[in-house]
Amino acid sequence: MGMRMMFTVFLLVVLATTVVSFPSDRASDGRNAAANDKASDVITLALKGCCSNPVCHLEHSNLCGRRR
């Protein structure tokens, strides 16, 4: 294989890898953003002591967890 042919193959591999990686990056960003929002809510409630308060825990059981 000549140098020009090897360079062409290299560029095709890089291009194919880049095109394949973009859709998966966009999909994971949405999931990560949703997980980060929920994590920030849990941290906020925990810092305020809400999860240790029975009444508040019942109102926000989706954020504090179902166990009590």
UniProtKB/Swiss-Prot annotation:
Residues 52-54 are annotated as: Ser-Xaa-Pro motif, crucial for potent interaction with nAChR. Keywords: Acetylcholine receptor inhibiting toxin, Amidation, Disulfide bond, Ion channel impairing toxin, Neurotoxin, Postsynaptic neurotoxin, Secreted, Signal, Toxin. Residues 22-48 form a propeptide. Residues 1-21 form the signal peptide. Pfam families: Toxin_8. One of its GO terms (molecular function) is toxin activity. Changing L58A: 1.5-fold decrease in ability to inhibit alpha-3-beta-2 nAChR. Expressed by the venom duct. Its main location: secreted. Changing S52A: 4.9-fold decrease in ability to inhibit alpha-3-beta-2 nAChR. It is found in: Secreted. Belongs to the conotoxin A superfamily. The cysteine framework is I (CC-C-C). Alpha4/7 pattern. This is Alpha-conotoxin MII.
